[in-house]
Amino acid sequence: SITIARGISPAQATALAEYTNQLPGVRLEAEAVRNYPNGDLAAHVIGYTGELTDEQLKARRDKGYRLGDVVGQMGAEAAFESTLHGAWGGQQVEVDNAGRIISILGDKPATAGQDVQLTIDLDLQRAAEAALGTREGAIVAIDPRNGAVLAMASWPTYDPNIFTTRITEALWQQLQGADHPFLNRSLQAFPPASTFKIVTTAAAIESGKYPPNTVLPTYPYVQVGGIQFGEWNRAGFGPLGFTGAMAWSADTFFYQVAMRIGGPTLIEMTRRFGFGRKTGIELKSEESAGLVPDDTWKRENLDTPWVIGDSINMSIGQGFMQATPLQVANMFAIAANDGYKVTPHLLKDNEEHRNWKESLELSDATIDILHRGLRQVITGGTGQSLNVPHLPTLAGKSGTAEAPPGLSHAWFGAYAPMENPEVVVVAFAEHSGGGGGKVAAPMVLQVLEAYFGKTQAETATAP
């Protein structure tokens, strides 16, 4: 059978029913449609459904799909399509010349698809979307102990209910607008800015060239050849160790580190943290792998070799380095987990992901410096707005990414409680024009307040 029209009005259905006996082979069928009761809440995670395209039908015909079938097109709807989709049933019938059924010759019952339960906490998702507001950007919250994605907000967004009926061409064109509402910005790649100093710190100490008690001078700029690589405050901060450099996000400290350890060492640690490849989340077709540049990539794409300035830029998460908010959240989870990496995932009760951890084999000295440095960001550095008495002990890091010719991006990531971390939150504001500590940190604070407010309330009401 071929679907001629879908989603017709009750009036159209009534009118058509009066003439079915004059239209041999044409019949009306009631069809179940998706209803998303929360509208655009978590739209990029849930996704939407739509009729099979010709290309999709060719690829799936041998799996029992047929023309006119509705399938998941984005998000969890697409990722878990094989689980959610049932199997067609059918009847072989004998009919008279008016199309009326005389007898049933054979009957094959349809089978329903299975339910899928996600790791998303709806209350935390609401808090994340409220914190993001109408800023282009993303907020991700994950459980660092197992990789469960608790919230994944992205704006601009859309209402998946609009796809339950045939969408108009005008609305489709609106959804293709310059602000790209279909894009899940949690899974798109941007320069990670100074959040990346977590990786640079780990690379420096693990290289053996910098002991944990290293103290370096900082400057208004570091000059290499004829190029000046400036400090963000244009003055320097005086002598700093790793924890102080992390707290104040001292660029010139990390420039010096990168110059000494070299690009290959920094690049190797970057890849150990999982950058440059997809995280493993189920939204495979929508996730960017980001970019970890190296000499080979630069020669192939820009026809020039890797130079020391590339290492300097990469040390502060700039240059060609690209990472998604989810990858950055995973980096914070590694710090929270004392050097163990987990797989971000959306499917609840997934034993494969829940029990899997990979050690980066970082030394105790490196882990200690990361914890103390990220804590000092909160107590006396660029993240002091999160140093509040009503929350558990936090650790975090800000980032402000240059993005010419547009305004800068703002980042902030944090985990808590520091003693036994159970949540990581990363906020990213695209082209916000403000620093991570000013723009993104308040968003992280708002989500953490929602998380710990809920857990404290649940603890208080537990029997």
What spans do the regions from the language model cover?
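Solvent-exposed, polar/charged alpha-helical surfaces in well-ordered, non-transmembrane soluble domains
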Residues: 2, 6, 14-18, 39, ...
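Conserved strand-to-helix beginnings and helix N-cap segments that scaffold or border functional pockets
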Residues: 437-441
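Alpha-helix boundary/capping residues
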Residues: 20-23, 83, 87, 131-135, ...
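A short beta-strand/turn structural motif
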Residues: 57-64, 346-351, 445
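Short hydrophobic alpha-helical segments used for membrane anchoring or interfacial signaling
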Residues: 139-144
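Conserved NTP-handling cores and scaffolds of large molecular machines
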Residues: 20, 49-52, 207, 339, ...
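Beta-lactam-recognizing serine transpeptidase/beta-lactamase-like catalytic domain environment
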Residues: 95-105, 145-194, 199-432, 436, ...
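Extracytoplasmic/periplasmic proteins that interact with beta-lactams or build/remodel peptidoglycan
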Residues: 1-138, 153-185, 189, 419, ...
